[in-house]
């Protein structure tokens, strides 16, 4: 199974590469043209753009000429919010606000938005897009589904998501224990 478990994380220098790297295709499980010219994009994790941005752009660009798009986030545990902005940017025609993040330690609200341009042809605002979610949909994956639904851009289909659309920090406090602390909401 390609599902990531926290026990697989070594929390060392190579952590980001291990979680989001090429060995898991930067979270892109499947890109497919289905019958009736429907595009399918199955994403398992949202990589930092410095690692997986080019792969995300390529995947989205491969589906640009489909008549409808299904984004499968049912097994996506989240990842980097900048990937949310990138994906959302392909699905709208202008800069749009996305959910923000409030930092408790800094007492600072950071607003997120779609990017003013994409490095591929945008999918556009008129073709139907469906986002599949499940209780395994978590963190940044939940944020993408929520943001696009709030913009009226997608139809969300599935179960109630797992939640967790808030950034956190973690510290290894023992070889067998990790402390996860939500720092933003």
Language model segments and positions:
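Extended, small/polar residue-biased N-terminal targeting/export presequences
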Residues: 1-35
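STAS-typified acidic loop motif
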Residues: 25-53
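Terminal peptide-recognition signature
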Residues: 41, 71, 129, 148
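Active-site-proximal beta-strand/loop segments in catalytic clefts of secreted hydrolases
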Residues: 43-46, 72-75, 103, 132-136, ...
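A short, well-ordered alpha-helical element
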Residues: 49-67
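Short, glycine-/small-residue-enriched flexible loop/hinge segments at domain edges that mediate gating
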Residues: 66-80
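Short, well-structured beta-strand/strand-turn elements
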Residues: 69, 152-165
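Gly/Ser/Thr-rich loop/hinge elements
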Residues: 79-132, 166-174, 183
């Amino acid at each position: 199974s390609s599902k990531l478990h926290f026990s697989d994380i070594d929390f060392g220098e190579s952590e980001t590469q291990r979680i989001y790297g090429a060995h898991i295709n930067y979270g892109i499980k499947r890109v497919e043209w289905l019958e009736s010219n429907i595009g399918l994009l199955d994403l398992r994790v949202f990589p930092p753009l410095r690692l997986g941005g080019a792969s995300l752009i390529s995947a989205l660009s491969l589906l640009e000429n489909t008549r409808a798009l299904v984004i499968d986030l049912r097994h996506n545990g989240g990842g980097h919010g900048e990937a949310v902005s990138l994906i959302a940017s392909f699905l709208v025609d202008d800069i749009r606000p996305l959910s923000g993040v409030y930092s408790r330690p800094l007492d600072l609200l950071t607003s997120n938005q779609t990017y003013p341009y994409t490095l591929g042809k945008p999918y556009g605002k008129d073709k139907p897009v469906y986002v599949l979610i499940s209780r395994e949909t978590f963190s940044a994956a939940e944020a993408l589904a929520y943001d696009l639904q709030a913009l009226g851009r997608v139809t969300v289909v599935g179960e109630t998501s797992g939640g967790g659309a808030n950034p956190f920090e973690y510290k290894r406090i023992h070889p067998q224990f990790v402390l996860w602390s939500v720092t933003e909401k």
